[in-house]
C-alpha cells in the first residue's frame, strides 16, 4: 500500500476533510510540537504530509527550517500546495512532493531530520517506510513519529453505540491494511530498522471538569473525526444507520453532561540515525 492512498484512508477526501485536518492540527499542536528536537535542523523530511497542516506548524515553529513533504494522495497534495503557497512568509521554505513512503525518491544523506504524524496507521508496512526514512537521513539526524493507540479511548457517561462504532472503525482500518494500534509498536519498529537512542512517550489526553473549555473543544473535534468515517463504514457494511444515530445521540449527551470525561492517548517516539 502506498503512503496514505485512497484505499487505506477511511476518513474520506475533499474540502470538509481538509478543514477537519487543519482543525485537528491546531487542537493537538501543543501536545505534539512543544519540544521537538529540530532546532538545529535545516532540511526536514515529512512523510505522509496530507494537506500540509503539520507542515505549516513546523515551518512556523522553526523559522530556519526547509521542509520537503511527501504525500501520495493527489487531492491532499494539491490542497497543501494551495494553502502553503498562499502564504508569502513560506515562499522558498517548502517542497510539497508526490511520492510513496515505501520508495522515497531521494538519495541517501539528503535530510538532517524527519517528522511523521498520523501516517503509519494507514500503511501496510510501517517498518519499510521507517527504513526508507532512515536511508535518506544523515548520521545523527533526529526523527519524531507520532501515532495512534486506539485501544485507549474512553468516554463517560458510558456510550455503547459509540464504542461499538469505534470497534468497527478500528476493524475496518485493519481490513484496509492499516493498524490503529501502531503507536504501541513504534519502539520495536524503530529498533528493527536500525535507529538508535529510541525513546517512546505515551501522551494522554484526559479532559474532565477541570478543563471544561478544552473538553468541549476536543469533544467537537472527536465527533467530527468519528463521523468522517461514517460513509465508508456504512458502505462497507461495518455499521448500520441505527448505530450511527445512536452514537450521535450519545455524543450530544456527553457534550452536555456536567461530569463528562474524555480520555485518549497517543505515542510520540523519538530516535536518531546512528
Regions found by a protein language model. Give the residues of each.
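Class I SAM-dependent methyltransferase Rossmann-like catalytic core
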Residues: 4-26
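C-terminal helical/coil "lid" or tail adjacent to the Rossmann-like core of SAM-dependent
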Residues: 10, 16, 199-260
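Conserved alpha-helix/loop element of class I SAM-dependent methyltransferases that forms part
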Residues: 23-42, 57
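Class I SAM-dependent methyltransferase SAM/SAH-binding core
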Residues: 43-45, 51-103, 128
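A short acidic, Gly/Pro-enriched loop at the edge of an enzyme's catalytic core
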Residues: 102-113
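A short SAM/SAH-binding and catalytic strip from SAM-dependent methyltransferases
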Residues: 112-125
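A short glycine-rich, Lys/Arg-flanked "PGG" loop and its adjoining helix->strand segment in the class I
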Residues: 127-142
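Conserved catalytic/acceptor-binding region of the Class I
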Residues: 144-212
